[in-house]
A protein has these predicted regions:
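A short acidic, Gly/Pro-enriched loop at the edge of an enzyme's catalytic core
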Residues: 154-166
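Conserved Class I S-adenosyl-L-methionine
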Residues: 7-9, 233-304
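Conserved beta-strand signature within the Rossmann-like core of class I S-adenosyl-L-methionine
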Residues: 187-194, 198
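N-terminal auxiliary segments of SAM/dcSAM-dependent transferases
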Residues: 1-58
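Class I SAM-dependent methyltransferase Rossmann-like catalytic core
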Residues: 57-84, 88
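Short alpha-helix
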Residues: 212-226, 253-262
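Class I SAM-dependent methyltransferase SAM/SAH-binding core
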Residues: 100-103, 108-156
Length: 305
């Protein structure tokens, strides 16, 4: 019988909700299977598409969008945001030997990789990356100690109850009910959204979409009553981008679904000048309510009275 791994305690069959076990062959992910006999084979790039046969009503980020995002992020333009997230995760996981991390809406896995690398060398983390884009999961599957799953965040997550210590939710849908289910009591969720002024200077020239002014309040509402907002941090990054980098910035986000790539590339090339913008983000740190601890405190107060 195959030895159980930490990941076997985090995954759940999307068909019957029994636990999923990961089978590796020659060190690479090969199959996911449950006791009821449901089986999912890994794609040759190492990710698993659990939406097979179900599909989704949402549009995945395409190959060009994902390639633009990978190139832009790997160039280090948003490194300050990754460092801020790494610092927070390192702080909340201090003393954990085998923490479990979920990146819900992981994209290429850039932030997940940076966060895992920020943990002490004595830590042996396991991670799950979820995203609706199979093109993104091809890249996220390369993050060490990570299982990459194609999945729709608005559905019940293919994950076990209370399986994760930390959850990352970066520029992605906030399924607060499911986030609360899969986080352990007292676990931490880090939600990143753009500030209203994010990239405002380049909105016209780059064809970017507008940003709602009330995103912070919307996140709190979406996370629900099982989470308490414990900290907020704003990160601003001034950027000076040449035409190729500006093209990648425009194509990698939601506007990439609507832009004409060649028209944008030609417009930026003809202009020739650098694009000056400021990336602006808000990190909201939430703690999942630990009802057992609350009850214990109440009982302690009652007995002392």
């Amino acid at each position: 019988m195959q030895q159980q791994t930490p990941l076997d305690r985090t995954l759940r069959c999307p068909v019957c909700q029994l636990g999923l076990s990961l089978d590796r062959q020659q060190g690479s992910p090969a199959h996911l299977g449950c006791p009821a006999g449901h089986r999912f084979d890994a794609a040759k790039q190492g990710y698993f598409n659990l939406l097979s046969g179900k599909g989704t009503n949402f549009t995945q980020d395409g190959a060009q969008m994902v390639a633009a995002r990978a190139s832009f992020l790997d160039a280090g333009h948003y490194e300050s945001l990754a460092e801020a997230l790494g610092h927070r995760v390192r702080t909340v996981l201090r003393g954990y030997e085998h923490p479990s991390v979920l990146d819900a809406g992981a994209g290429t896995g850039y932030y997940l990789r940076q966060v895992l690398q920020a943990l002490p060398g004595t830590t042996a983390p396991s991670a799950v990356a979820l995203d609706i884009s199979r093109y993104a999961m091809r890249r996220a599957a390369k993050v060490p100690n990570t299982v990459a799953l194609v999945w729709d965040l608005w559905r019940d997550l293919p994950l076990q109850d209370g399986a994760f210590d930390v959850l990352l939710n970066i520029f992605s849908p906030h399924n607060g009910t499911e986030f609360a289910r899969v986080l352990r009591p007292g676990g931490t969720a880090l939600v990143v959204t753009p500030l209203p002024e994010h990239l405002a200077e380049g909105a016209g020239s780059l064809g970017l979409l507008g940003i709602a002014a009330d995103k912070a309040a919307g996140v709190v509402a979406a996370m629900g009553e099982e989470f308490i907002l414990t900290a907020t941090e704003e990160v601003r990054i001034p950027l000076v981008l040449d035409p190729p980098a500006a093209f990648e910035l425009a194509m990698m986000g939601p506007a990439g679904h609507h832009l004409n790539p060649e028209a944008l590339r030609n417009r930026l090339s003809d202009a020739g000048n650098a694009t000056l913008v400021t990336a602006a983000f808000r990190i909201q740190e939430f703690r999942k309510v630990d009802e057992n601890r609350i009850q214990a405190n109440l009982e302690g107060l009652s007995s002392s009275g």
